[in-house]
Amino acid sequence: MAQGQGFGFGLGKIKELQDAFQKAQQVQQGAKVLQEELENMEIPGQSENGLVTVYLSGNQEPRGIEIDPALLSQDLEIVAGSILEAMKVAYDASTETMRSKMEELTSGLNIPSM
């Protein structure tokens, strides 16, 4: 080891480490706010025939379902298929919303490596 070089963990690296910890705290605080926001969302998913709408939170928790009475006169397989289709659409929309919100939260972190 050359004289005066120490372990390579000088003041510059300490400052980077402090910045990284500060950013991590900001993300943690933002994550708490985001969690509440996702819990309070109501994201719809509609079947292709438009007769069923399912609502999920941003955390994919079921919130409600609306079924057009006209669907109930259909064959059971059509009813079940419409419900499943609406659930899948709502789930996809909810997970995409969560992914997008997480990207917003963590964008620009640029945490340095040590």
Swiss-Prot record:
Location in the cell: Cytoplasm, Nucleoid
NCBIfam families: DNA_YbaB_EbfC
The keyword Cell division is assigned to this record: no
UniProt lineage: Bacteria, Bacillati, Cyanobacteriota, Cyanophyceae, Oscillatoriophycideae
Name of the protein: Nucleoid-associated protein MAE_23910
Source species: Microcystis aeruginosa (strain NIES-843 / IAM M-2473)
Main location: cytoplasm
GO CC terms in record: bacterial nucleoid; cytosol
Keyword entries, A-Z: Cytoplasm, DNA-binding
Pfam families: YbaB_DNA_bd
Family under the similarity heading: Belongs to the YbaB/EbfC family.
Function according to Swiss-Prot or TrEMBL: Binds to DNA and alters its conformation. May be involved in regulation of gene expression, nucleoid organization and DNA protection.
Annotated transmembrane regions: none
The protein's assembly and partners: Homodimer.
UniProt cross-references to InterPro entries, sorted A to Z: YbaB-like_sf (IPR036894), YbaB/EbfC (IPR004401)
GO MF term list: DNA binding
